[in-house]
Curated annotation (Swiss-Prot):
Residues 47-70 are annotated as: Disordered. Component of a cullin-RING-based BCR (BTB-CUL3-RBX1) E3 ubiquitin-protein ligase complex that mediates the ubiquitination of target proteins, leading most often to their proteasomal degradation. Residues 205-307 form the BACK domain. One of its GO terms (molecular function) is ubiquitin-like ligase-substrate adaptor activity. Keywords: Kelch repeat, Phosphoprotein, Repeat, Signal, Ubl conjugation pathway. Residues 94-170 form the BTB domain. The lineage of its organism: Eukaryota, Metazoa, Chordata, Craniata, Vertebrata. It holds the Pfam family BACK. This is Kelch-like protein 11. InterPro entries: BACK, BTB/POZ_dom, Kelch-typ_b-propeller, Kelch_1, SKP1/BTB/POZ_sf. One of its GO terms (biological process) is proteasome-mediated ubiquitin-dependent protein catabolic process. GO terms for cellular component: Cul3-RING ubiquitin ligase complex; cytoplasm; cytosol. Kelch repeats lie at residues 360-407, 408-453, 455-501, 503-556, 610-661.
Length: 708
């Protein structure tokens, strides 16, 4: 009633205003007629102004204005859509009902004209050809989850169809994507794909990849697939992987690029997937088993684990595949013994997957003949007993430290002043080097080891310093170093072992006030990274061959000038303390050629329980210095040392470490360019040498003239 009264009053006021305007117009017209009559009586002629089609402005010589203008209100559409949405909320003028079987059984009222204009999904549905158009009800059934989408999500998507606005979160994006796909809201669907791209992570890449396939988001599927492919060995540890349907499992096993640790792991993955729903999935086992590369499995594993497996033993095709693989291994072993071992076959099914992680002993930096710094990295490919080229580092490294983490290889420091603070890390998955935050001090010959995901830099010395006591820690997430409390004494030529992800055992040298050859004394100490306390001990814990070897040579010049890759052990510190001993057996040195221990500047590292000695030099005199390319391996299984194929070129003061690199970067012959910064520096050195040589020649000319 109040609204009607207000409307009547507004209409009366408008009518009164119109009456006043009409009276004023009539008075003006009467006055004009009287003036015109007087003018006619006075002159006998009348000037009617410009002729037809000529405006007053044109007659007076001015610019004519437009006869018509367009008006557009930019906010009108948004205000209109907002008002329509408000009407929908209030149930005004609604002529269609959306009924969701899920969503708590809720019904949502709307306007069919708006829905039909918003998406092609509703245009044919509400145009009269279907019963929904006549009944005014649209039943929405068959959702991905039993309850259906949440009511709040449905409301948000309907509001988007009215206003073009919506808020999507990680909790709602799946349902929004499903609704957008059902209602053919292409732009909203694309937005959900971009949103999921930003949220893609190792923990959700399997689920997002499945969503991308389900809703045909090709770009999102490619990005998620690439993440899964490069981290497949981690993805298969997630229980969500074992919920995937057969066709996706088959696709992944067919992929040559998946990163895996071994084919044995893939066999166990197939078994685990089948056993999750044996009644339904056993029929797929044979097809999946054919996709495994049995020739890449160890013979003992084939005979002890694969062959006795029930799913294999009860399938004739699988039994034959295992027998063929065992026979190939036997022929290969026979060829090796007879000395007729041929090059690895090129048949793709007999080679490792390109993404399979292979064991490599990586050699980094160092100095070669003539004092040339080496940026080239090389690797000893363990399975194929050969050396391969790896990417160049961007620094001149000499006396640097190395540490291996789960994802990277870090190198830091150098005797070369221009690179003494630099830190680089190698990513095996990408086969690339990248710079990270530099050290806080220029130094070399220090210890570098990982504890709980952080790198600890301990001791070292510089070109003009007797040594350092400093302890700094690097946080990879922040890409930043910060100082901790210093060690109680100077520590140089540091070698480190980490125990229990807390304690760092260190073998080093420290300056002493006594008459010795170099004024240094060997020390062994333990650093607690939690309490930051130091304690001297008698020896490194004698845990494995790597520890025994180091303690056997700890007082030798061979060990003190060598670099040693740090190693981490999972055993508790109490057990490690019990393995400390004052007397150490040198049995591990029995089969090592005696001349090896006279080498200086070698690189020492480990692989499982084996020990490697690589490169170095003989004779400290610069004139007679002999750079070495030999490499030795202590085989724990055979309990003896073996001479490996020589490195491509001799080098000393390098570092070495064990790293797992995908086969795609190891097969064939690789060539990598030298980094631009080192090429420029090399050219500059060459130019300086030419200038120096020219200057010497110029000096010789006058002196020869004087002598004449």
């Amino acid at each position: 009633m109040a609204a009607a009264a207000v409307a009547a009053a507004a209409a009366a006021a408008a009518a009164a205003s119109l009456q006043v305007l009409e009276m004023e117009s009539m008075e003006t017209a009467a006055a004009g007629s009287a003036g015109l009559a007087a003018e006619v009586r006075g002159s006998g002629t009348v000037d009617f102004g410009p002729g037809p089609g000529i405006s007053a402005m044109e007659a007076s010589g001015g610019d004519p204005g437009p006869e018509a203008e367009d008006f557009e209100c930019s906010s009108h559409c948004s205000e209109l859509s907002w008002r329509q949405n408000e009407q929908r909320r209030q149930g005004l003028f609604c002529d269609i009902t959306l009924c969701f079987g899920g969503a708590g059984g809720r019904e949502f009222r709307a306007h069919r004209s708006v829905l039909a204009a918003a998406t092609e999904y509703f245009t044919p549905l509400l145009s009269g050809q279907f019963s929904e158009s006549r009944s005014g009800r649209v039943e929405m059934r068959k959702w991905s989850s039993e309850p259906g989408p949440e009511p709040d999500t449905v409301e948000a998507v309907i509001e988007y169809m009215y206003t073009g606005r919506i808020r999507v979160s990680t909790g709602s994006v799946h349902e929004v994507l499903e609704l957008a796909d059902r209602f053919l809201l292409i732009r909203l669907k694309e937005f959900c794909g971009e949103f999921l791209k930003k949220k893609l992570h190792l923990s959700n890449c399997v689920a997002i990849h499945s969503l991308a396939h389900m809703y045909t988001l090709s770009q999102l599927a490619l990005k998620a697939a690439d993440m899964i492919r490069r981290n497949f060995h981690k993805v298969i540890q997630d229980e969500e992987f074992y919920t995937l349907p057969f066709h996706l499992i088959r696709d992944w096993l067919s992929d040559l690029e998946i990163t895996v640790d071994s084919e044995e792991v893939l066999f166990e993955t197939v078994l685990k997937w089948v056993q999750r729903n044996a009644e339904e999935r056993e029929r797929y086992f044979e097809e999946l088993f054919k996709l495994l590369r049995l020739s890449q499995m160890k013979p003992t594993y084939l005979t002890r684990h694969v062959k006795p497996e029930r799913l294999v033993a009860n399938n004739e095709v699988c039994v034959k595949l295992v027998a063929d693989a065992v026979e190939r291994h036997a022929l290969r072993a026979e060829n090796i013994q007879s000395g007729t071992c041929q090059h690895p076959t090129s048949h793709v099914s007999l080679l490792p997957r390109y993404g399979q992680n292979m064991d490599v002993i990586m050699v980094i930096g160092g100095v070669s003949e003539g004092g040339d710094y080496l940026s080239e990295c090389v690797g000893y490919f363990v399975d194929e007993d050969r050396w391969v080229n790896l990417p160049h580092i961007h620094n001149h490294l000499d006396g640097h430290a190395v540490a291996v983490t789960e994802s990277y290889v870090y190198v830091a420091g150098s005797m070369e002043p221009g690179f003494a603070k630099t830190v680089e890390r190698y990513n095996p998955n990408l086969n690339t080097w990248e710079h990270v935050c530099s050290l806080m001090t220029r130094k070399h010959s220090f210890g570098l080891t990982e504890v709980k995901g952080k790198l600890y830099s301990i001791g070292g010395h510089g070109n003009f310093s007797p040594g350092f006591k400093d302890v700094t820690v690097y946080n990879p997430e922040l890409d930043k170093w910060h100082n901790l409390e210093s060690a109680p004494k100077i520590l140089r030529d540091v070698k480190a072992l980490a125990i229990e992800d807390r304690f760092v055992y260190i073998a080093a040298r420290t300056p002493v006030d006594r008459d010795t050859e170099d004024g240094l004394k060997a020390v062994i100490t333990c650093y607690d990274t939690e309490t930051r306390q130091w304690q001297d001990v008698e020896s490194l814990p004698l845990i494995d061959n790597y520890c025994f070897f180091q303690m056997s040579v700890v007082n030798s010049n061979f060990y003190q000038t060598a670099s040693c890759c740090p190693k981490s052990y999972c055993l508790e510190n109490e057990e490690a303390v019990r393995k400390i001993a004052s007397q150490v057996s040198d049995e591990i040195l029995e089969s090592l050629p005696p001349e090896v221990l006279s080498i200086e500047g070698a690189a020492i590292c480990y692989y499982k329980d084996d020990v490697f000695i690589i490169g170095g030099w003989k004779n400290s005199d610069d004139i007679d210095k002999q750079y070495r390319k030999e490499a030795y391996r202590y085989c724990a299984e055979r309990k003896r040392w073996m001479l490996l194929p020589p490195m491509p070129q001799p080098r000393c003061r390098a570092t070495a470490c064990h790293v797992r690199i995908p086969y795609r970067y190891l097969h064939g012959t690789q060539r990598y360019p030298m980094p631009q910064n080192l090429m420029w520096q090399k050219d500059r050195i060459r130019q300086m040498q030419e200038i120096h040589r020219h200057a010497l020649n110029m000096r010789r000319v006058p002196s020869s003239q004087i002598e004449c």
